[in-house]
Amino acid sequence: MDFLLGNPFSSPVGQRIEKATDGSLQSEDWALNMEICDIINETEEGPKDALRAVKKRIVGNKNFHEVMLALTVLETCVKNCGHRFHVLVASQDFVESVLVRTILPKNNPPTIVHDKVLNLIQSWADAFRSSPDLTGVVTIYEDLRRKGLEFPMTDLDMLSPIHTPQRTVFNSETQSGQDSVGTDSSQQEDSGQHAAPLPAPPILSGDTPIAPTPEQIGKLRSELEMVSGNVRVMSEMLTELVPTQAEPADLELLQELNRTCRAMQQRVLELIPQIANEQLTEELLIVNDNLNNVFLRHERFERFRTGQTTKAPSEAEPAADLIDMGPDPAATGNLSSQLAGMNLGSSSVRAGLQSLEASGRLEDEFDMFALTRGSSLADQRKEVKYEAPQATDGLAGALDARQQSTGAIPVTQACLMEDIEQWLSTDVGNDAEEPKGVTSEEFDKFLEERAKAADRLPNLSSPSAEGPPGPPSGPAPRKKTQEKDDDMLFAL
């Protein structure tokens, strides 16, 4: 039959296929391949002539480089041509006599040719499975699988390229049916019957991957670049902004970016299972990971910001304490009441708190007492006149003047000794009874008695050089002590 039809390469499309599959070519001539597709779509005999030329180049050819170029031309035509060409290519006769015959063991094809043929059969079987008039390749595919032939799984993403051209094929097929109306009305009915089941493949597009065209790939990558730009801007804003100090305009922009990226992620998640291009799928997964990371950062940002704002009203009362880092004078006084409110009713805790409070007050009182004591001693040293004991007249006159100015009552030496003994016994008793601490009143009394003892003791040894102790030596220390007591009471 082929002999009667003449040389397959003599037709316009055959000549171009011969050039496109020449073994001298280093790689595919895509411009020539697309020209072949245009001739097939535009001429009436284009599909048949092209298929005859491809069959001539593949069958029995030992130059497997030319065979690979012919398979590439065939694949390109299936992706870009219409239903008329698909009917011829998917026929059981062409698949079995051309493709399956090429990979027979007796021909000893290289692995690259073997895998290429199996990929074409598998992709066409999956693409044309829903079309009743294109099931010849499906039958061959199922027979090969039942015989145990393993199809390569790494190139399964090549299954989908046929779906995208089929969406445009419907219009071309409808147009071809309209062109044939004038020739035969029965052909119009047949074309209408064939056009009815053709919309079935788009229904399967949601279940099977889609191979985008180069224009769609470029548009998708530009949109992915836009998504990546939004992610970068949002990430930089989250890095620069402080949650508690962010401006309302910045927060509004951040929320807008978040909403935009959320919408973009939904589209990315829809495209991931639908795209058959492995490289595009990888890019979509990377973009999705970046979106998830920036969403996590935004959630932490919002959680910290809203957490600070919700805690602000409850912390409004101690705001002054947070600002004033100095010591709180009321902290010691309120410590016992705070611990009492916490039901810490231990006696040791209360005793410790009382000692802390008493020690604070005693320290202040002791400082005041030391100041008044120093000033009173200095004044007394300036006013007292020291004279020899022989000058009884001068001493008696000084004592009389001292008594008149202060109104003090002189006491005897025996009374002084009794007071000292009483103070010592009281001190020992208090130490034995109250080991936990002393109060402010006891400490004042202690200081007063010690002051009295310090003033009295030096005067006991002063008259030993001149005779027995007499009344003149006692009243002077007593008067000084009385004045110091008055000064201390005035200071307190």
Swiss-Prot record:
Record's comment on post-translational modification: Monoubiquitinated.
Effect in UniProt of substituting residue 256 to N: Reduced interaction with UBC/ubiquitin
Gene3D superfamilies on file: 1.20.58.160, 1.25.40.90
DNA-binding keyword on record: no
Domain VHS: 20-152
Residue positions of motif KRKK: 48-56
GO CC, one annotated term: early endosome
Phenotype for residue 264 to A: Reduced interaction with TOLLIP
Span list, region Clathrin box: 321-326
Main localisation: cytoplasm
Compositional bias annotation for Basic and acidic residues: 442-455
Phosphoserine PTM positions: 11, 160, 176, 180, 355, 376, 461-462
Similarity section: Belongs to the TOM1 family.
Domain-related comment: The GAT domain and the VHS domain are required for the interaction with polyubiquitinated proteins.
Subunit and interaction comment: Found in a complex with TOLLIP; interacts (via GAT domain) with TOLLIP (via N-terminus); the interactions leads to TOM1-recruitment to endosomes and inhibition of TOLLIP binding to PtdIns(3)P. Interacts (via GAT domain and the C-terminal part of the VHS domain) with UBC/ubiquitin. Interacts (via clathrin box and C-terminus) with clathrin heavy chain. Interacts with MYO6. Interacts with TAX1BP1; CALCOCO2/NDP52 and OPTN; the interaction is indirect and is mediated by MYO6, which acts as a bridge between TOM1 and the three autophagy receptors.
Purpose of the protein: Adapter protein that plays a role in the intracellular membrane trafficking of ubiquitinated proteins, thereby participating in autophagy, ubiquitination-dependent signaling and receptor recycling pathways. Acts as a MYO6/Myosin VI adapter protein that targets MYO6 to endocytic structures. Together with MYO6, required for autophagosomal delivery of endocytic cargo, the maturation of autophagosomes and their fusion with lysosomes. MYO6 links TOM1 with autophagy receptors, such as TAX1BP1; CALCOCO2/NDP52 and OPTN. Binds to polyubiquitinated proteins via its GAT domain.
Name of the protein in question: Target of Myb1 membrane trafficking protein
